[in-house]
Design a protein with these regions (language model features):
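Conserved alpha/beta-domain cores
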Residues: 4-106
């Protein structure tokens, strides 16, 4: 229970900071919210105030959130973690953007 309260507090602090800078950045700049470790309800809260880009580095954790939040069509999922060859298909199918490449196989 204490961990949830602590996490919830951090989300509130970050939302406050987010709202302060949101209107100060140019319109062609997107904020990428790293949602690793946050619950789907917390993602929904920040998405409701206009944050649509979310970064995840763990494929299975991200996939579970994507299923729970599939009705929020505005969300753009970014994969920001190390790519493992056995997870490439799932990454390509479930993320709009991929920001990392681990290695090229010959």
């Amino acid at each position: 229970m204490g961990e949830f309260i602590h996490t919830n507090f951090l989300v509130k602090v970050n939302l406050s900071n987010y709202l302060k800078i949101k209107n100060k950045i140019p319109s062609n700049v997107n904020i990428l919210a790293v949602s690793k470790g946050f619950k789907s309800q917390e993602i929904k809260t920040i998405q409701n105030i206009g944050q649509n880009d979310f970064g995840e580095s763990k494929v299975q954790e991200a996939y579970e959130k994507q299923l729970l939040l599939k009705d929020l069509k505005q969300i753009k999922w970014h994969f920001i973690g190390r790519i493992q060859s056995n997870k490439i298909r799932k990454i390509v199918q479930n993320f709009k953007y991929i920001h990392s490449v681990d290695s090229f196989e010959k």
